[in-house]
């Protein structure tokens, strides 16, 4: 096994079935790349990423655990977000929530 390798059955797989998702267009206005991991609270990402932060509150990237999305300088891309589950308590990141969503 290779670290990070996904071993799955054949066929199509759906991540986070039954959970609310949101599609957003995100623009990197910085002069450097910005990378966001799978479980980072998307509303608290680097301020140089331009998107509707209020809409992204309580959500993360809808990608496989441990994966990340990289935004190159000036790049605009569409991402899908998914609601955090469980107790929906967020600590850390940029310190903007520090508690229940």
Curated annotation (Swiss-Prot):
Q: Which organism is it from?
A: Variovorax paradoxus (strain S110)
- Looking at the keywords, is Cell wall biogenesis/degradation present? no
Q: Does the keyword Cytoplasm apply?
A: yes
Stated family: Belongs to the urease beta subunit family.
- State the UniProt keywords alphabetically: Cytoplasm, Hydrolase
- Reaction catalysed? urea + 2 H2O + H(+) = hydrogencarbonate + 2 NH4(+)
Q: In which pathway does it act?
A: Nitrogen metabolism; urea degradation; CO(2) and NH(3) from urea (urease route): step 1/1
Where does the record say this protein resides?
Cytoplasm
Protein name per Swiss-Prot or TrEMBL:
Urease subunit beta
Tell me, how does this one assemble? Heterotrimer of UreA (gamma), UreB (beta) and UreC (alpha) subunits. Three heterotrimers associate to form the active enzyme.
- Gene Ontology annotations for the cellular component aspect, listed alphabetically: urease complex
Under the GO molecular function aspect, what terms does this record hold? urease activity
Against CDD domains, the record matches this protein to:
Urease_beta
Please state the Enzyme Commission number of this protein. Answer: 3.5.1.5
| Subcellular location, principal | cytoplasm
The record, for InterPro entries, names: Urease_beta-like, Urease_betasu_sf, Urease_subunit
- Which biological process, per GO, is one annotated for this protein? urea catabolic process
